[in-house]
Amino acid sequence: MPVFDANGIPLYYEEAGSGEPVVLVHGALCDHTVWKPQVDVLSAKYRTIAYSRRYAHPNNREGDLMDSTVQNNAEDLAALIDGLGLEKVHLVGHSYGGFIAAFFALKHPDKARSLTLANAAVVTMLVARPGATASISLLFRSPSVALSARNLINATNDTVKAVDGGDATAAFRIFVPALSNHRTDLPQKPPSFEAMVTRNARTLRETTAPFPPVTKSEVRGIKAPTLVLWGALSAPWDYKVSQLLAQVIPGARAVVVPGTGHFFFLENVVMANEKMLEFLEALDHN
């Protein structure tokens, strides 16, 4: 079992294929297995590396999730890239992993060949300075975004409380539906999805750790060629964050995947993989 020691933090990883390296960064409640549909396709042309972030299955899960911050995960990623002898990598990040990938690209621009942000949860872009005043301002500017963000916060708190009480299934029952405002018309995810979310339920607590104050002005500093993808049926806060990323990052390409939500890359695998490959192959020809 390949495990890399990132400054004392064990990170399990799997790789397939050869060529330019592509590193896949998963979100909360997930692990490296969430990327299997992408690894199967990308590895035909690229050295594709999917790893489990700190405390995600099958890593040691007994640590303090409050130290699984965006900043610490970005440094774990830097250590993994260096440890595998890589120089520049194509980064693909989803949700909390998308925030990590974007933050990494800002802090380690020399290591980011490109950036693919999949429903990246860079929520700090919604308000310049988090707090009551900013929340009220957001409510007046965009009520649906503010209310959906509040729904997500409530779902997060309810889920963390339930998981702490021993109910790991709460992550799938309470939190996942809240990502798309409890929509019931989304395509089915793989049968393995519920099991993955349940075994990683405890990791949701990492999203309650303080976020780095990454604003729109800072995001403009991303230099790597960037593809921003998101599901058309994502919750309003989620949709808005991806829109902002696509608008603010210089030269970013934007793709909205119809009929899908927060996990669009599992709900429409064919289109998601097609758009990722198109983006990467275009860079190969530049």
Regions found by a protein language model. Give the residues of each.
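Glycine-rich His-Gly loop
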Residues: 24-27, 53, 95, 120, ...
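Conserved alpha/beta-hydrolase catalytic His-Asp/Glu region
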Residues: 150-205
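Catalytic active-site module of serine/aspartate enzymes centered on a nucleophile-bearing elbow/loop
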Residues: 251-286
